[in-house]
Amino acid sequence: MYLKTLELHNFRNYADLVVEFGSGINVLLGENAQGKTNLLESIYFLALTRSHRTNSDRDLISWKTKAARVSGSVQKEHTVTPLEINLSSKGKNAKVNHLEQSRLSQYVGQLNVILFAPEDLSIVKGSPAVRRKFIDMEFGQMSSKYLYNSAQYRSVLKQRNQYIKQLQFNPKGDQVYLDVLSDQLAAHGAEIIFQRIQFLKKLEKWSQEVHKEISQGKEKLSFQYVSPISSDQADTTEKIYAALQALFQKQREKELQQGKTLVGPHLDDVRFMVNDKNVSTFGSQGQQRTTALSVKLAEIDLMKEETGEYPVLLLDDVLSELDDSRQTHLLTAIQNKVQTFITTTSLSGVAQQLINEPHVFNIDHGVLMQSKEE
């Protein structure tokens, strides 16, 4: 698949933009703070209905305007699918083929993207929350079931936390309702954990191949899903459900003391291991970057395997963060098969010998012009 056209109206610093992209390499060239990252953000938003930079959709609407629109057309095989998201103070709606979708989870998956930015190096050395978000965003594009269970889990988790706080002020309150919420949370949580583990097994397989090539066979990469639920309890959703139920009962007194849910997939983590050592703790910066790059490149082939289509790759100023060897592995992996958007302040930072006839766009204060320098 590839993004054929993009239209922006009052999105960030773009008042009105209509552009047609190439199916291969698209280079977004410009000085800092001109709108390169904003353009990538709009593509990410068109794919996932949310930004990777802010949790507030209001931040995406241009200053002193009340609404924004992001739309585009996605080419798949012999079909072109129009996509559109409208934003306002009242919320947002998403359309596929000009038909509004009743749930955003029905929309996600029409355009699949993989974003690689400097901060993505933190999927290895960052907090567990960063890694959970990584799993949720990437796997969510491949599985509507995962998106559904995640949304339901968040909703029930919010209700359960609110009720636990009520019980703090009223210890003699009805705990039967807490049992009901615990049951619902365990059901959705079991689905999430099981699907995460299956997803990580597949991602691990692809990541190991890439990592072996980059490290020239000197290192072995592996993943560990970190949860209070042991691996022998996690091979079926039924076992995970039972384990979560037991943990909720065990932690109830502490939860009532602290006023929140203390176990569940919203607190789990992923550990990246190189030669059986936690690379976030014991790995060098080079090993951490190789691991992050391996995981990101593996996503491309995994998404192709799961969806039948290669995703669109967004590289936001990431080439400057990679040495020549890792940059070469990255660009070689995507050459001639993945539509790619690269932001850069200079073409000298892009390995020209690896890019076949790129489309170059100059960006200046939210105005985009296609360059003749191609």
Swiss-Prot record:
What does UniProt give as GO cellular component? cytoplasm
Question: Where does the protein end up?
Answer: Cytoplasm
GO terms for biological process, alphabetical: DNA replication; DNA synthesis involved in DNA repair; double-strand break repair; SOS response
- Does the entry feature the keyword DNA repair, yes or no? yes
Q: What's an example of a GO molecular-function annotation for this chain?
A: ATP binding
The residues that hold ATP are G30, E31, N32, A33, Q34, G35, K36, T37
* Assigned keywords, A-Z: ATP-binding, Cytoplasm, DNA damage, DNA repair, DNA replication, DNA-binding, Nucleotide-binding, SOS response
In UniProt terms, what function does this protein have? The RecF protein is involved in DNA metabolism; it is required for DNA replication and normal SOS inducibility. RecF binds preferentially to single-stranded, linear DNA. It also seems to bind ATP.
What family does the database annotate?
Answer: Belongs to the RecF family.
Protein's name according to its UniProt entry: DNA replication and repair protein RecF
